[in-house]
C-alpha cells in the first residue's frame, strides 16, 4: 500500500472550521435581512397611505364628500390597484405579519387604512 505524502488538500478539521464560520455569518445576516424587509414593507405602507390620503383630500375638495372606496380615486391616482406588501412590517413599534390584502378608506376620518390602522401606526420603535 502506498502512502501519500506532501499532497495538498483540505483536512476534515479545516472543512469543519470553514463551515462553522459560514454558519456564524449566516446567523448574523439572516436577522438583519428580515429586519430590512420589515423596514422596506413599513416604508411602502407609509408611502401608499400618504399618497392615498392626498388623493382623498383632493377628491373631497372636488366632490364635497369622502370617497367610499379606493376605486373612486381613479382620477386622482395613476393606478387604483394599490395593494399592501406581504410579509412582516412594523406596526405600533412591533413586528407583525401583515394580514391586509387591500387598503381601505375610513370615511368618518377621511383617511386611508391598512389593517384597520392609519399611517401613524406604522413605525419602528426607536432604540
Mark where each language-model region is.
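N-terminal leader/signal peptides at the extreme start of proteins
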Residues: 1-10
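Alpha-helical hydrophobic helix detector
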Residues: 16-32
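Extracellular/periplasmic head regions of type IV pilus-like filament subunits
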Residues: 54, 60-127
Amino acid at each position: 500500500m502506498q502512502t501519500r505524502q506532501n499532497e495538498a488538500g483540505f483536512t476534515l478539521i479545516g472543512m469543519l472550521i470553514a463551515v462553522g464560520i459560514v454558519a456564524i455569518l449566516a446567523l448574523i445576516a439572516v436577522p438583519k435581512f428580515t429586519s430590512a424587509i420589515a423596514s422596506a414593507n413599513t416604508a411602502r405602507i407609509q408611502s401608499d397611505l400618504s399618497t392615498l390620503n392626498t388623493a382623498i383630500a383632493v377628491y373631497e375638495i372636488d366632490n364635497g364628500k369622502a370617497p367610499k372606496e379606493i376605486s373612486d380615486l381613479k382620477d386622482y391616482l395613476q393606478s387604483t390597484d394599490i395593494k399592501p406588501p406581504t410579509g412582516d412590517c412594523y406596526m405600533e413599534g412591533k413586528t407583525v405579519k401583515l394580514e391586509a390584502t387591500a387598503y381601505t378608506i375610513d370615511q368618518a376620518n377621511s383617511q386611508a387604512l391598512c389593517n384597520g390602522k392609519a399611517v401613524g401606526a406604522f413605525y419602528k420603535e426607536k432604540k
